[in-house]
Amino acid sequence: ENDVLKVGSEDFAYSEYTSEYRNTIDAYMRWGNLVASAGWTYAFSNKLFGKLSGFYTRYRSKIRYKEEDVSGKEGDSGYKYSLDETTNVTGITDFGVRTSFDYRPVAAHRIRFGGDYLIHYFQPEYNRMKALDNSLPDSMQIAKTFSDDKLWAHELAAYAEDDWSISDAFRLNVGLRFSLFNIDNRTYTGIEPRVSMRWLLSPDVSLKASYSRMNQYVHLISNSFMDLPTDSWMPVTNKLKPLVSDQISLGGYYNWNQLLDFSVEGYYKRMNNLLEYKDGYSLIPSSVSWENKMASGEGRAYGVEFMVRKQTGKTTGWVGYALAWADRQFDEINKGRRYPSRYDNRHKLNIVVMHKLSKKVELSAAWTYSSGNYTTLSLENYY
């Protein structure tokens, strides 16, 4: 699937010095995904099931910014023409295989294990720049291409977890995941423990708690405060380390008369080795290597979520509200001071309603409200 977005402007002016002046600005964006997968499931016995799958994904994004200035008419002695054009192309392609197994040795244990292997092909940035001005000599005209090396990476992971029903009231899930990422003669490894538990206080009331650690070797970098598909997938390198996050959560749940489910959950997430563009780099492509545009820092995300859900009767649905905070801290951004993340949406409200008219016909409606994304607007411009 491919999508295209084009925006632009054109200004005209007349003065005593020139018969015509025209300024034209065009911005062009194109992006798309291609996905293919195949899988095979097999029952080894009534206690062991396995699945093998292979997949291919490709993502590409292209941005072009073009500005033209024309003064006078071509052929006249006072004719002036200038052009500034920059084009950026970025993308990632993945090939992979994944195995997963589900083993139930006894009623109290459900063991899941498996692994996956991926080959990543990165094109971090391909920049083409052009600057023409008919008032300057040919030696000062610019038409250059800057391309970062295309990168190949290998990612390997293996995991195992046990869902253990210790009693009718208490359930424990314990898991461990090992990951390995190799790129440009550098290998990173990570251990990711995960544990969650559920305690049934009564038939209608339960508590849940969890902790998890995650290592991420491919960073999603946003270079715009707008919700545009201009984000880039960037790998870890010798300079840039993997993202490491730790998250804890605690929740309470109540079922009222088998009719309504009420829940409240709180969470706290800590992230290290986050990447953001340094101050001064934006949506418009530049000739600076992508690694040198990056700043590394830390972040936090925490909040509380409330939900009411109805799952019986002809009319069902749910209402959810989240009160959340998210911030970032980078030594090279905002003078090292902590600031709200782009995704620091303080309030979020979701309402979903479904109604069955008959066995074959169902109507549904959804409404979402969310606080806007944070951004910083410049106070001064220099030309």
Q: What residues fall within each predicted segment?
A:
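Outer-membrane beta-barrel channels and translocator barrels
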Residues: 45-47, 104-108, 167-171, 200-204, ...
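Outer membrane beta-barrel strand-and-loop segments of large Gram-negative receptors
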Residues: 90, 94-100, 147-151, 157, ...
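Surface-exposed extracellular loop regions of Gram-negative outer-membrane beta-barrel proteins
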Residues: 11-14, 60, 128-129, 203-248, ...
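Gram-negative outer-membrane beta-barrel transporters
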Residues: 167, 268-270, 288-380
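Hydrophobic, lipid-facing positions within transmembrane beta-strands of outer-membrane proteins
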Residues: 32-38, 54, 93-99, 154-160, ...
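Face-selective signature of the C-terminal outer-membrane beta-barrel domain
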Residues: 30-184, 263, 311, 318
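Residue-level signature of outer-membrane beta-barrel architecture
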Residues: 41-42, 93, 99-105, 163-164, ...
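Transmembrane beta-strands of outer-membrane beta-barrel pores
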Residues: 2-3, 56-60, 117-123, 176-182, ...
